[in-house]
Regions:
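N-terminal accessory/interface modules of nucleic-acid-binding and processing proteins
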Residues: 1-276, 283-284, 289, 294-311
Length: 311
């Protein structure tokens, strides 16, 4: 029970830590963007214990699905498992703490290439009904998507926040201010994580001061509301983008195979023509060289020349 209590306290303490300044919050989001498939509390605890993590999974998944063994002495990342009646701990390991064995493989981690950005931009514009003014660049589109998604679910994510605000800095703020600040913080946080995972620089549109109100969420009880909003919305959009990137990459690979096959076919035909030309030239050369009409190696009967006995 003591270890479970330690992790609960770690979550509380780290929530205060990452909300203590805009830079600390951005540091947390750098980790969360890489691990967007995890819920907020898991992201928070992973950042507290292994901030450089890139791909985390259970020991069983690494061993049985990926055929990767966890390194001797590696420390598991403790997470809170609250799915059952009683909260318990579960452990995950980052890929950096594993190594491949025979038949092992690495997880697929999609990466958006620069030449794919235009197609992703087109997809986002169609999927989210973006206006033309929001499709100048991929960064513009991601900001518009973040703004739209937060606005659509704002009431859901704010529900209950006023009751959790007791004893926090939010307690002294009026409802309109809390609502406005939450909406802006959530939008900017979603945008930040989308950009980070897509390989873009979020600070081209943002400034550090845009996250100044994060310090009002100085306890886990209220930070969870903001964290859940940013995490869940980011996950939804990034899953969509990831699938689109994968689809584009598969199509590019298919075209490359077709081009390669066509190139090989053309090379094969060229080689056949060249070989035929060489054979024709060879026949002409043999027929025009000295000796008999049958060349120098064959007798008139078509066999090898009969050797004369040694004298």
């Amino acid at each position: 029970m003591s270890k479970l209590q330690d992790i609960r306290e770690l979550a509380q303490e780290h929530a205060t830590s990452v909300s203590s300044s805009p830079r600390d919050w951005m540091g947390y989001m750098d980790t969360a963007a890489r691990l967007y498939r995890y819920p907020f509390t898991d992201q928070l605890l992973i950042h507290a214990q292994h901030p450089q993590a890139t791909a985390c999974a259970s020991l069983e998944l690494w061993n049985e699905k990926m055929f990767r063994w966890v390194n001797r002495g590696a420390r598991g990342i403790a997470l809170l498992d609250e799915n059952g009646h009683n909260t318990r701990l579960r452990y995950v390991f980052d890929i950096s703490d594993t190594h491949m064995v025979a038949g092992g493989r690495s997880p697929y981690l999609w990466q958006m290439q620069e030449h794919q950005q235009e197609e992703i931009l087109t997809h986002l514009a169609e999927a989210y009904g973006l206006e033309e003014k929001d499709t100048g660049t991929l960064s513009d589109a991601l900001m518009a998507v973040a703004r739209e998604m937060v606005a659509d679910s704002l009431e859901e994510y704010l529900d209950g926040l006023e009751y959790a605000a007791e004893g926090t800095y939010l307690e002294d703020l009026d409802e309109v201010t809390v609502r406005s600040d939450f909406r802006q913080l959530a939008t900017d946080s979603v945008y930040y994580m989308l950009c980070r995972r897509c390989g873009l620089e979020p600070m081209e549109l943002l400034e550090e001061e845009d996250f100044m109100h994060i310090t009002d969420y100085n306890r886990l009880s209220v930070l969870t509301f903001l964290g859940n909003a940013a995490s869940q919305i980011s996950e939804s959009v990034l899953i969509d983008i990831g699938r689109t990137v994968h689809k584009i990459s598969l199509e590019e690979a298919r075209k490359e195979v077709e081009i390669s096959n066509e190139r090989n076919y053309n090379n094969f035909n060229t080689l056949l023509r060249e070989n035929k030309g060489v054979e024709n030239n060879k026949e002409e050369n043999i027929e025009n060289e000295g000796g008999t009409d049958y060349g120098t190696d064959l007798s008139p009967q078509g066999g090898l020349p009969v050797s004369e006995p040694d004298r």
